[in-house]
Amino acid sequence: MNDVTVVNCPTCNKQVIWDELSTWRPFCSKRCQLIDLGEWAAEEKRIPSSGDLNDSDDWSEQPLDRQ
């Protein structure tokens, strides 16, 4: 069985074969990878959240005991 997985590049929608030889997968090229990274760095893309945390919210970490 020789199933070939093909995905679309998230940046330009060019088809990319998903295997070890596809260096930039899921992107088709280093250029498309850097365009995507730049969009994240410029905060054009983000992971949705339920809201911002503020100092009064409960945190999962324990406060440091500074003595």
UniProtKB/Swiss-Prot annotation:
Binds 1 zinc ion. Keywords: Metal-binding, Zinc. One of its GO terms (biological process) is regulation of DNA-templated transcription. Residues 46-67 are annotated as: Disordered. InterPro entries: DNA_gyrase_inhibitor_YacG (IPR005584), Znf_NHR/GATA (IPR013088). The keyword Zinc applies. GO terms for molecular function: DNA topoisomerase type II (double strand cut, ATP-hydrolyzing) inhibitor activity; zinc ion binding. Zn(2+) binds at C9, C12, C28, C32. Its cofactor is Zn(2+). It holds the Pfam family YacG. PANTHER family: DNA GYRASE INHIBITOR YACG. Inhibits all the catalytic activities of DNA gyrase by preventing its interaction with DNA. Acts by binding directly to the C-terminal domain of GyrB, which probably disrupts DNA binding by the gyrase. Interacts with GyrB. Belongs to the DNA gyrase inhibitor YacG family. This is DNA gyrase inhibitor YacG. It comes from Erwinia tasmaniensis (strain DSM 17950 / CFBP 7177 / CIP 109463 / NCPPB 4357 / Et1/99). The gene is yacG.
